[in-house]
Curated annotation (Swiss-Prot):
Keywords noted in UniProt: Calcium, Cytoplasm
Protein task: Involved in calcium binding and microtubule stabilization.
Name of this protein: Translationally-controlled tumor protein homolog
Gene: Tctp
Chief location bin: cytoplasm
Cytoplasm is among the record's keywords: yes
Subcellular location field: Cytoplasm
Lineage: Eukaryota, Metazoa, Ecdysozoa, Arthropoda, Hexapoda
GO molecular function: calcium ion binding
Length: 172
């Protein structure tokens, strides 16, 4: 299994257990699904509670959301109220990534710059449909992943987008 972590914060962003697609060599699109989980709900197969005693039950907590977000403890951020604030973040973040690439993979700098401009124009055009997520540390200096709902086979499906060059791949 591979875990993809933010190269700036070290936060776990996603794993290869989801359907992934690399777009224009710079964005991973990771397809998730909406799930509801109940914590604290104890069910024992074949268990028959006594009719004589009142069932005290357990405190069960329920959480719903995108499986990628829940499994990797991503945190929704509302830091970008408009396109302009998101564009400012992107420019700063891209500078950080270019600096990292120049150190670690200089051959990828031109690929990144060229393809990223194209991809970002497309993403900025859909800005109003996006939700934004940081890693568990909630550090906006690192990667801010995007989530958009797409109609896939008639079902509204969450698709998370992550910057390939902002990720460190670890094998487990």
């Amino acid at each position: 299994m591979r875990i993809y972590k933010d190269i700036i914060t070290g936060d776990e962003m996603f794993s290869d257990t989801y359907k992934m697609k690399l777009v224009d060599e710079v964005i991973y699109e990771v397809t998730g699904k909406l799930v509801t989980r109940t914590h604290g709900d104890v069910q024992i197969e074949g268990f028959n509670p006594s009719a004589e005693e009142a069932d005290e039950g357990t405190d069960a907590a329920t959480e719903s959301g995108v499986d990628i977000v829940l499994n990797h403890r991503l945190m929704e951020t509302y830091a970008f109220g408009d396109k302009k604030s998101y564009t400012l973040y992107l420019k700063d973040y891209m500078k950080k990534l270019v600096a990292k690439l120049e150190e670690t993979a200089p051959d990828q700098v031109d690929v990144f710059k060229t393809n990223m401009n194209k991809v970002m124009k497309d993403i900025l055009g859909r800005f109003k449909e996006l939700q934004f997520f940081t890693g568990e540390s909630m550090d906006c200096d690192g990667m801010v992943a995007m989530c958009e709902y797409r109609d896939i086979n008639g079902v509204s499906t969450p698709v998370m987008m992550f910057f390939k060059h902002g990720l460190l791949e670890e094998k487990f």
